[in-house]
């Protein structure tokens, strides 16, 4: 599958074309994801010859053993989560850009460059793989599936009272 590079640097390929509605900025959506560690990462569990992780799946909402399995809820355009407490709905710019071009039922492959992910700072211990924080300058490779767009009134009513979805360990 060939990824096309967008002007922003996001690499994008359609796996399944969706047939449902298309979300807009500030919409709350439910999505599945599978995330692979991208370039810019080193640790004790990597390809020593190339000094990078290669095709290492580190998080998936399809994983039945993951306590947070099932589709996750994000608000397109919400602040990038970088602190110790993830607030329900937070997203990253690369996901937002892709979601705005998708339709419900669609699935895409992405290669999100660092400036559209967690950038120069990286992210807190919440966003981890094998107990390490998401490091600075890390790209993210993922597949995402747009499951549902939540009705506008429903998410506007829910989010102010939602509080933290879960905290870093």
Language-model-detected regions and their locations in the chain:
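Cross-family detector of peptidyl-prolyl cis-trans isomerase
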Residues: 1-169
């Amino acid at each position: 599958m060939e990824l096309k590079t967008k002007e922003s640097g996001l690499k994008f390929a359609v796996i399944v074309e969706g047939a449902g509605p298309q979300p807009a900025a500030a919409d709350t959506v439910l999505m599945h994801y599978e995330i692979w560690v991208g370039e810019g990462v080193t640790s004790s569990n990597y390809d020593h010859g190339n000094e990078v992780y290669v095709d290492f799946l580190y998080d998936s909402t399809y994983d039945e053993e993951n306590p947070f399995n099932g589709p996750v809820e994000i608000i397109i355009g919400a602040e990038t989560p970088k602190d110790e407490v993830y607030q329900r709905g937070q997203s990253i710019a690369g996901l937002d850009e892709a979601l705005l071009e998708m339709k419900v039922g669609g699935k895409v492959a992405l290669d999100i460059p660092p400036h559209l992910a967690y950038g120069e700072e990286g992210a807190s211990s919440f966003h981890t793989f094998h107990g390490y924080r998401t490091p600075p300058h890390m790209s993210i490779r993922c597949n995402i599936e747009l499951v549902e767009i939540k009705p506008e009134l429903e998410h506007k009513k829910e989010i102010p009272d939602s509080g933290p979805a879960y905290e870093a360990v």
